Structure formats: structure tokens, C-alpha cells
Amino acid sequence: MSTKLFVLAKKNRKIKRLVQHINEDAELLQLWKCANVNAVDRGGISDHGEIHIRIVANAALKMLRLLVQGGVEPGVVKNHGLEQDDAELIVVLAACLHDIGIAVHRAHHERYSLFLAYPKARELLKGIYEEPDLTTITSEVLHAIVAHNAKEICLTIEAGVLKVADALDMTEGRSRIPFEKGRVNIHSISAQAVDSVDIEKGEKKPVKLVITLANSA
């Protein structure tokens, strides 16, 4: 089965064009596969390929939209005068590129992702943005990528939702491959314990996260 990205773009035409570019990019699709080989087959950790990308992209997009509905202003809107559609594109593209550095090595992969993501982001954004917005969007994407490291501070809402979305990809199916291979670690055990993760509109806060546990692990 061919690798494809599916994102709930709604009326965001920029995201629709981006997803088309991504699904036609053989190099990026292969980087996802290479990253997953290093993660699952060689590293014994949970899936970090196309399934992870799809989950993170859609989760980040949903949280961003809920935050905007709740009156939170994305960084690219506040600081660069761009629009919500641009912020949405940033989180989707950052999700698609944040783990490609694992194709090099899991350790310090955020920084490896940066040097792979810079030319790839600009390539994927051709026809969607012109300068100076092309460089602005690329810069925001790179910040979100490096800031998904637990030790890095997120300076934008876009980076923050990517970081949270990445952490929320922890349901039971994510750990199936390493767990069945007998590779029991924090990634497989924690994921085996989580039945579902739901992102909902909050009552007091813009976003509510509902995590259902299913295993005493």
C-alpha cells in the first residue's frame, strides 16, 4: 500500500496544495519509511512513520483550531501579520518533517531533522508562497521542529501544539510492533496502557484532552 498523507484541510486551500505536494514527493515518503526502519526495526520503539505523521498532523491541526476559536492568536499571525490558514499549514508541515531526522539517527534527531527539513520545506512550499512569506513560513516550521524536543522552549502556539500532539500519539496500536517482538520499554509499555486519546472543546479552557487507560501496565 502506498504511503499517503490525509489531513482534514476543511476550507484551507493552502493545506490542500501542500498535501498534494507531499503525496507526490517520493523523497519525503521514503524518508518516512527510513525513519520508521530506524525507529521500529532497529531501535525497538513505537511507530515513527506515516501513521505517526498522520496522527500528529491531524491532532495538532485540531488543537490549533480549538485554540483559535478560544481567542488564542497563533505566532505567525501575531508577529508576522499572516493568517490562520498559514498557522494551520505550519503545524501540518512541521508534523510531516519533525521526525525525518530519525532516518539518520534517533539520538538528537530533532537537529538532524532541521538540515533535512530546510530545503525540503522550501521545495514543498513552492507555488504556495513567494518571498518574504516563503522564508517566514519555513522559519516557523523549523522552530516547531526543533522545539518538539522536551528540553526546548516553544516560542509559538504552532510549536506548542506540535509538541503536545507528538506526545499524545500514545494509544495501544502504536506499540504493537515492538511489543509483539518482545521489545518492552517505556514506549511500548506506556502505549499499551492507553486505550484512546480524544481532543475536545473545553469548557473553561479552549482544549480538553480525554485520555482513557485500558491496561494496568
Regions found by a protein language model. Name each.
Residues 1-24, 28, 42-51, 58-85, ...:
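Divalent metal-dependent phosphate-bond-processing catalytic cores, especially two-metal-ion Mg2+/Mn2+ enzymes
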Residues 33-39:
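Surface-exposed beta-strand-to-loop junctions
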Residues 87-89, 109, 137-141:
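Short, conserved alpha-helical segments within structured domains
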Residues 90-94:
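Active-site alpha-helix of zinc metalloproteases
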Residues 108-118:
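Post-HEXXH active-site segment of zinc metalloproteases
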Residues 121, 140, 145-147:
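Extreme N-terminal leader/targeting regions
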Residues 123-135, 152:
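Inter-helical turn/loop segments and adjacent helix faces that build the functional surface
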Residues 133-140, 170-176:
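A structural motif
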